[in-house]
């Protein structure tokens, strides 16, 4: 006779076993109608799940945080059902939930077309409207293999064959379609009201390029139509802001097959890059960092000693010369320890803050490469601080101050912080971990920072703070990290002489703010839709002539701007001024300075912004002062 404890603390007593749906109906018919699933003693289950013993229960409705994953998984099955109905020869493979949606891979003799997607989506709506019941059953593994082979679903049979022999499997049926799945699922297809198929792409079976190519259909699903429409709007905005398209349109960079995942920077793109580096270099000097430079190619012996060769070898580019094996560095940490080790260190030398714009290479899979966001050659704003355990808190507090200040200058004020805490397998004593975790927490408290704990997600060598930005579309980008490391200094024999004369191992703090310059530039381009703040814009102002008579004056204006440190250009072409304004507006140049006969006569310029705002006429000195002040203000404008 089960006693069921509800979230409000009330306990319901029942005389006989009953389903989640029955409990919901006992509370109210409206709740039963809205119930999507249940969470029994923390485990998600279907509404048909039979409660036989005492338990705690949460009824999951579309308002619950668990609902979207269940809705999306169920919609993936709805997609597979629709494809099988329209294209019976297609074979189903896998259909997981992903961020903001789902996908399903199919083996089919041809590629699905946009017209196919429209037909499939229409069929999905038809099946959802039919409100087909979704039921669950279990089959022994060997029976399940034979069952799917009998249906002609060879891929599904192969998936099941990889599951341990003694394991029972669950299958879900809706109408005449049945698929392998752990569940849970919504009670019926009528719960699936807001979905959209977004694209189709190729995908290798089991992610192996040696296997056959499958057709992957992507989709999104939400609890209601309003949420779906909001998401599709964000998707449309993201498409407009795609840094790869803007990079081409604004002539910033390009990629080529001759160097996969490596950027060819054009003059304007490189100007932005240099501005980032110049800005970061100045900020690091303000915070007491010493800039260093370390080799690109390092003997494998260092990587073996640091542990990278054993754990990171597949992601490293390696080469051999003169019977020695080298690796192009994937990260700078071991090399920074070599600089620390060069010469005896005393406790008086700590903390020692070393920074490098580290040029790193990683052998990312070709399928994972994505514009500037995922590259093989990246420059990281690496820094490593060597300090004592007692200095961790003050150093981390200083890092957090720098992180907040830098992000603000780039226009990011909504920062999310996550504290990755000790995992089960780790180096160092509990006392040391206690001290380090407490130091990180106190440093964040001192900066009035709120954070989320992530138990067990720290690296084996120390806890970590992750700093993530929220962009204008609400997307979260993890950029900054502050990582405590108890392992690498000892591995690489770093030491210092303590106050009592004993030899001690320093703590090493890994710190990045932008992450990789390439990825951060991609984030900036998308956040601002190419309209970068004035201080970052590759061309900050352009002088536009109305006729050839103003050419000499336009050159004088440009030179004056350049002498004042403003990146300026001019357009002396014999084109209509409206054409010039439109062209440079599309190039996202912040200020357009128009000069005609009147402006020449009065030593002025007519000022217009890229957003079409007419600021009137100004003297050359006034526009120089205006732009200079805006550049100085950076992200505070």
Curated annotation (Swiss-Prot):
Q: Which gene encodes it?
A: thrS
**InterPro entries membership:** aa-tRNA-synt_IIb, aa-tRNA-synth_II, aa-tRNA-synth_II/BPL/LPL, Anticodon-bd, Anticodon-bd_dom_sf, Beta-grasp_dom_sf, TGS, TGS-like
Q: Where in the cell is it found?
A: Cytoplasm
The protein's matches in PROSITE patterns, at most eight in alphabetical order, are given as: AA_TRNA_LIGASE_II, TGS
Textual note on the cofactor: Binds 1 zinc ion per subunit.
Instruction: Provide the protein name.
Output: Threonine--tRNA ligase
Q: How does it assemble?
A: Homodimer.
Where does the UniProt entry say this protein principally localizes?
Answer: cytoplasm
UniProt lists the family membership as follows:
Belongs to the class-II aminoacyl-tRNA synthetase family.
- Can you tell me which residues bind Zn(2+)? 333, 384, 510
Spans annotated as Catalytic: 242-533
Q: What class of enzyme is it?
A: ligase
- Entry-linked Pfam families: HGTP_anticodon (PF03129), TGS (PF02824), tRNA-synt_2b (PF00587), tRNA_SAD (PF07973)
What does it catalyze? tRNA(Thr) + L-threonine + ATP = L-threonyl-tRNA(Thr) + AMP + diphosphate + H(+)
């Amino acid at each position: 006779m089960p006693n069921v404890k509800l979230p409000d603390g009330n306990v319901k007593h029942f005389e006989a076993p009953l389903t989640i749906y029955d409990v919901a109906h006992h509370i109210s018919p409206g709740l039963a109608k809205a119930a999507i699933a249940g969470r029994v003693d923390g485990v998600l289950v279907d509404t048909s799940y039979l409660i036989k013993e005492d338990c705690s229960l949460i009824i999951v409705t579309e308002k619950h945080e668990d609902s979207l994953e269940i809705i999306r998984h169920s919609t993936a099955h709805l997609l597979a059902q629709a494809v099988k109905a329209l294209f019976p020869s297609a074979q189903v493979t896998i259909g997981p939930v992903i961020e903001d949606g789902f996908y399903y891979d199919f083996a089919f003799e041809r590629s699905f077309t946009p017209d196919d997607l429209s037909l499939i989506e229409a069929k999905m709506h038809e099946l959802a409207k039919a409100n087909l019941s979704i039921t669950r059953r279990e089959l022994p593994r060997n029976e399940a293999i034979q069952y799917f082979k009998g249906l002609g679903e060879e891929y599904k049979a192969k998936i099941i064959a990889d599951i341990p022999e003694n394991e029972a499997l669950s299958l879900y049926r809706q109408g005449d379609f049945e698929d392998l799945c752990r569940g849970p699922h919504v009670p019926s297809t009528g719960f699936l009201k807001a979905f959209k198929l977004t694209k189709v792409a190729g995908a290798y079976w089991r992610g192996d390029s040696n296997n056959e190519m499958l057709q992957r259909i992507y989709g999104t699903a939400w609890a209601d139509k309003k949420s779906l429409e909001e998401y599709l709007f964000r998707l449309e905005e993201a498409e407009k802001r795609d840094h790869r398209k803007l990079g081409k349109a604004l002539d910033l960079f390009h990629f080529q097959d001759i160097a996969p995942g490596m950027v060819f920077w054009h003059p304007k793109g490189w100007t932005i890059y240099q501005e980032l580096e110049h800005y970061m270099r100045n900020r690091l000097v303000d915070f007491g960092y010493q800039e260093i430079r370390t080799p690109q190619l390092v003997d494998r012996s260092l990587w073996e000693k640091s542990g990278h060769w054993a754990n990171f070898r597949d992601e490293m580019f390696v080469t051999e010369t003169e019977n020695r094996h080298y690796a192009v560095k994937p990260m700078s940490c071991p090399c920074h320890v070599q600089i620390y080790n060069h010469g005896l260190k005393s406790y008086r030398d700590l903390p020692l803050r070393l920074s490098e714009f580290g040029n790193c290479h990683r052998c990312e899979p070709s399928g994972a490469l994505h514009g500037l966001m995922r590259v093989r050659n990246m420059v990281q704003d690496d820094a490593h601080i060597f300090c004592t355990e007692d200095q961790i808190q003050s150093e981390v507090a200083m890092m957090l101050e720098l992180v907040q200040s830098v992000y603000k200058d780039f226009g990011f004020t909504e920062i999310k912080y996550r504290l990755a805490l000790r995992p089960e397998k780790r180096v160092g004593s509990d006392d040391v971990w206690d001290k380090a975790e407490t130091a990180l927490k106190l440093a964040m408290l001192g900066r009035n920072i709120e954070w989320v704990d992530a138990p067990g997600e720290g690296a084996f060598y120390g806890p970590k703070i992750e700093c993530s930005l929220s962009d204008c579309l609400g997307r979260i980008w993890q950029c900054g990290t502050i990582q405590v490391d108890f392992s690498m200094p000892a591995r690489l024999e770093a030491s210092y002489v303590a106050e009592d004369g004993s030899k001690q191992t320093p703590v090493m703090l890994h710190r990045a703010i932008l992450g990789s310059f390439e990825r951060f530039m991609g984030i900036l381009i998308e956040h601002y839709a190419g309209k970068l703040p004035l201080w970052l814009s590759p061309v900050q102002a352009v002088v536009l002539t109305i006729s050839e008579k103003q050419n000499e004056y336009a050159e004088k204006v440009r030179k004056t701007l350049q002498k004042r440190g403003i990146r300026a250009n001019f357009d002396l072409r014999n084109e209509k001024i409206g054409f010039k304004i439109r062209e440079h507006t599309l190039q996202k140049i912040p200020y357009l300075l128009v000069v005609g006969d009147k402006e020449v006569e009065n030593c002025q310029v007519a000022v217009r912004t890229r957003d079409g705002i007419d600021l009137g006429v100004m003297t050359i000195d006034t526009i120089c002062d205006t732009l200079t002040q805006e550049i100085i203000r950076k992200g505070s404008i």
